[in-house]
């Protein structure tokens, strides 16, 4: 992640961050390492979500696990897959909790930028990806 995106000869992450920052309502879904990038872009700019995060906060690869989480953004439980997952250590006033594991925050959102410490793409449940598509479709329809 850091080797390609922040390499002086690569323009990948700066272009992505510019695209995200260009529209605060643009829906973005960052999972695991993507959540880290949203919280700590590392490009000298402000965080893209109003939260602090600890890399590998849930432990090593051997500590990886699966557990049902309360997905407040979806209004239902969701099968969370945690692989060397980051841990949210604090959230600011602009952050909305989108998911919890027991009482611990595992998902936050600022505007339409959602950061998740787990891997929804490995769960077999498309709920968070459907949220992303619905939000993008609604913004597109509202702009016409």
What does each of the following model-derived ranges do?
Residues 29, 81, 114-116:
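Hydrophobic/aromatic beta-strand patches that form the interior of the parallel beta-sheet core
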Residues 1-30, 35-41:
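Flexible gly/pro-rich beta->alpha loop and the following alpha-helix that scaffold active-site loops
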Residues 42-104:
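Pocket-forming structural segment of enzyme catalytic cores
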Residues 31-33, 49, 84, 118:
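A secondary-structure boundary/capping signal
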Residues 77, 87-144:
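C-terminal and late-domain segments of enzyme folds
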Residues 38-40, 65, 125:
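Generic hydrophobic alpha-helical membrane-span motif
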């Amino acid at each position: 992640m850091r080797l390609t995106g922040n390499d002086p000869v690569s323009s990948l992450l700066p272009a992505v961050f510019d695209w995200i920052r260009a529209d605060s309502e643009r829906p973005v879904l960052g999972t695991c390492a993507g959540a880290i990038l949203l919280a700590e872009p590392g490009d000298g700019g402000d965080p893209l979500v109003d939260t602090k995060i600890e890399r590998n906060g849930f432990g090593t690869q051997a500590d990886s696990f699966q557990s049902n989480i309360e997905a407040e953004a979806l209004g239902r439980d969701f099968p969370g897959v945690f692989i060397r997952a980051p841990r949210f250590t604090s959230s600011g006033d602009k952050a909305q909790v989108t998911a919890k594991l027991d009482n611990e925050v595992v998902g936050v959102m600022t505007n339409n930028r959602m950061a998740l410490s787990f891997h929804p793409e490995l769960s077999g449940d498309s709920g968070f990806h459907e949220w992303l598509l619905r939000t993008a479709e609604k913004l597109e329809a509202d702009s016409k």
